[in-house]
């Protein structure tokens, strides 16, 4: 039986460091609704949610391969729940002292480390077999944001930055 989807793709915005999760190797415009914004308006203030998905502004952050689709779905939903939980938490007193534009930028800058740490936390809680989850990063220093469980095997090859993820076979065949 062919697995429908067992890959999780995570993209980051090159200017704001916001993070989007995807089930495919390219982003769909509906992915923007993952970005936290409390009001139900199509355009968020001061760029908290871009009005349109510009694919040249989003670069691959990491790719995770799971043993099967059910594990992938579980981790994907938990990551979305972590993000939702984080967006409704009250701000710390240090953040409240900052002017609103500075506060928003600081919160957005923390999305990459928070997402990576959340992923590691979920993988620590789930009991996957050893080396069953493969992780490929665009920057090896990003792996330092978390303590990875033994079930995670970090790929030595970095992701090539482009407007989407490119599979190794596709790049090799093009040469």
Swiss-Prot record:
Molecular functions per Gene Ontology: DNA strand exchange activity; single-stranded DNA binding; structural constituent of ribosome
One GO CC annotation: mitochondrial large ribosomal subunit
UniProt record, GO biological process: mitochondrial genome maintenance; mitochondrial translation
Record keywords, A-Z: Mitochondrion, Ribonucleoprotein, Ribosomal protein, Transcription, Transcription regulation
InterPro entries per UniProt: Ribosomal_mL67 (IPR024629)
Localisation: Mitochondrion
UniProt subunit comment: Component of the mitochondrial large ribosomal subunit (mt-LSU). Mature yeast 74S mitochondrial ribosomes consist of a small (37S) and a large (54S) subunit. The 37S small subunit contains a 15S ribosomal RNA (15S mt-rRNA) and at least 32 different proteins. The 54S large subunit contains a 21S rRNA (21S mt-rRNA) and at least 45 different proteins.
Similarity field: Belongs to the mitochondrion-specific ribosomal protein mL67 family.
Task of the protein: Component of the mitochondrial ribosome (mitoribosome), a dedicated translation machinery responsible for the synthesis of mitochondrial genome-encoded proteins, including at least some of the essential transmembrane subunits of the mitochondrial respiratory chain. The mitoribosomes are attached to the mitochondrial inner membrane and translation products are cotranslationally integrated into the membrane. mL67/mhr1 also has extraribosomal functions, being involved in regulation of mitochondrial DNA recombination, maintenance and repair, and generation of homoplasmic cells.
Protein name: Large ribosomal subunit protein mL67
Recorded name of the encoding gene: mhr1
